[in-house]
Amino acid sequence: SDGMGIDAIFDKLPNLKRKAGLVLIPTTCGTGSEVTQLASINRTRLGTKVGMGCPDMYADTSVLIPELLYGLPNYVFATSSIDALVHAVESVLSPNATPYTKLFGYQAIEMIIKGYQEVEKGGVEARNRIMGDFCIASNYAGISFGTAGCAAVHALSYQLGGKYHVPHGESNYAMFTGVLKN
């Protein structure tokens, strides 16, 4: 980016070329972006969050290290894993969904729900034991939404998150049931 501000990067994104290899290591169990060409950024000046992407944003290597997530505060774990769940649900419902994206999306949904049930029974100790499953589920959701896309939940949550600085997973949660009911 050669010292460019975020507005310049965003405007020139299609023409930017990476100058070095890219290794991505997620530190939450939410976005799955380590396997996509996509990122969400807060455009504070505009009062919104936006998605951005270009082929050079694909990682050369992506590494999942569940132990990095052991110390996540409960709130961060909850909001980031809800983001993964919403990614998976929106991607399987997307008109762009394929058998491939549905395979990964449905598997992510199953793993996340099963994980929540385990955490409910066993607390933080159980969460740490199955953190690898949450990392994989988030990764699967990333594979699914990276191709199929997201939809109304994300479109609405970007506005809430950008204007009021609500964490992405929390704003997704706030919109999720209302959007699915309609």
Regions found by a protein language model. Name each.
Residues 113, 117, 157-161, 177-180:
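Amphipathic alpha-helical segments within well-ordered protein domains
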Residues 38-148:
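Carboxylate- and glycine-rich phosphate/diphosphate-binding segment that chelates Mg2+/Mn2+
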Residues 86, 97, 159, 163, ...:
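Glycine-rich flexible loops
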Residues 151-169:
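Histidine-centered catalytic micro-motifs
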Residues 163-182:
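Gly/Pro-rich interdomain helix-loop hinge
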Residues 109, 131, 135-138, 153, ...:
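A general structural signal for well-ordered alpha-helical packing
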Residues 1-66:
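Glycine/threonine-rich beta-strand-loop-alpha-helix active-site module
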